[in-house]
Amino acid sequence: MTDNPFYRYKNLLKEYILPNAIPVLWKNWNDPRRAYHNMDHLDRMIKQLERNVHNFSRSEFEQLILAAFFHDAIYNPRDPQGNEDKSIQFFRRVYIGKNERFDLVDKAIECTKYRKRPSPFPLKVFWDADNAGFRDSWDSFLRYENAIRKEYSFVPLDEYKKARIEFLEKNIGLFGPKGDINIKKLIEYLQNI
């Protein structure tokens, strides 16, 4: 139970989020149509952030954790260009912090739209946490790819492969040698299925 981020951060969520929004977040992250952008992704991302807790003030860390909960709170593969903006709007609607401004939450969610590592340190750590799968083992990386394909199963395979390869090519050079090996291997895999 303690591995569940909603359990680990229940007090943080209760402090800053409208009570009726927490079950909505839970439902969204557990939507059965989400094969990759689900609770496992959220948990992996938060664990990456927790490894860096000592690098942040309490306020920064809390904002990054909230941003993790909200960065894919709204996720629709049929309209992927609007997901981050809708997630930010959702956060703004349900945020109840009275005395603190949580601009870092918006900025962190916003930075996940782009295939460029941001330079401000908190945003860089957040972006890296969201994209940590690029550096995972090949088996894990392929498992993530298969999950993403399930989310886009409505797209014909040839169209999916073309768009996915274009996306992957934009990521070469962003994640070091391990990431590049995975990306190139996945491109080859997609070209041959």
Stretches with model-predicted labels:
Residues 79-82, 141:
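Cytochrome P450 core scaffold surrounding the K-helix E-X-X-R motif
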Residues 45, 61-77, 87, 106-113:
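His-Asp-centered metal-binding catalytic motifs of divalent-metal-dependent phosphohydrolases/nucleases
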Residues 18-24, 36, 81-84, 99:
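Short catalytic/metal-binding and nucleic-acid-binding patches
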Residues 12-28, 41:
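Short alpha-helical hairpin
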Residues 21, 57-63, 97-111:
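Acidic/histidine metal-binding catalytic segments
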Residues 56, 76-80, 98, 116:
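Amphipathic alpha-helical interaction segments
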Residues 3-12, 30-37, 47-58, 62, ...:
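Divalent metal-dependent phosphate-bond-processing catalytic cores, especially two-metal-ion Mg2+/Mn2+ enzymes
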Residues 45-46, 82-97:
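An active-site-proximal "capping" alpha-helix that borders the catalytic cofactor pocket
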